[in-house]
Amino acid sequence: MTEESKQRVIQEYVPGKQVTLAHIIANPNEDIYKKLGLVLDKKDAIGILTITPSEASIIAADVATKASNVSLGFIDRFSGSVVISGDVSSVESALNDVLEVLGNMLNFSSTKITRT
């Protein structure tokens, strides 16, 4: 293959303002806690969020922990991932509040909360 026949592909990351995942694992297996590195006395529900731009995960974590009785399990400001834990109703309430603030106050595109 000659230099002239090679194609060059450039991939760009162009973030939008969106919540792409809002999920509740109501009764997680204990292995999930171990694999995530969550060290908690009580194995409650887990809430998962994925947000773009990733810096908004900081806002989501703040809203979630102030809105309800949940613990912050994980936040990654580089990937936009947030993991919270608590009883099912607290996790659901926290996720609803996060979606409300990001969607209505900050004009993010949002998703529905899913559950397993």
UniProtKB/Swiss-Prot annotation:
PROSITE patterns: BMC_CP. The keyword Aminoacyl-tRNA synthetase does not apply. Keywords: Bacterial microcompartment. One of its GO terms (biological process) is ethanolamine catabolic process. Residues 8-108 form the BMC circularly permuted domain. It is found in: Bacterial microcompartment. Pathway: Amine and polyamine degradation; ethanolamine degradation. GO terms for cellular component: bacterial microcompartment. The keyword Chaperone does not apply. CDD domains: BMC_PduU-EutS. It holds the Pfam family BMC. InterPro entries: BMC_CP, BMC_dom, CcmK-like_sf, EutS/PduU/CutR. Belongs to the EutS/PduU family. Homohexamer; unlike its E.coli ortholog the hexamer is flat. Its pore of about 10 Angstroms in diameter is closed in the crystal structure. Interacts with the N-terminus of EutC and of EutE, targeting them to the interior of the BMC. A component of the bacterial microcompartment (BMC) shell dedicated to ethanolamine degradation. Expression of the eut operon may allow this bacteria to use ethanolamine as a carbon, nitrogen and energy source. Unlike its S.typhimurium homolog, does not make BMCs when expressed in E.coli. Targets at least 2 proteins (EutC and EutE) to the interior of the BMC. Proteins such as EutS containing circularly permuted BMC domains may play a key role in conferring heterogeneity and flexibility in this BMC. This is Bacterial microcompartment shell protein EutS. It comes from Clostridioides difficile (strain 630).
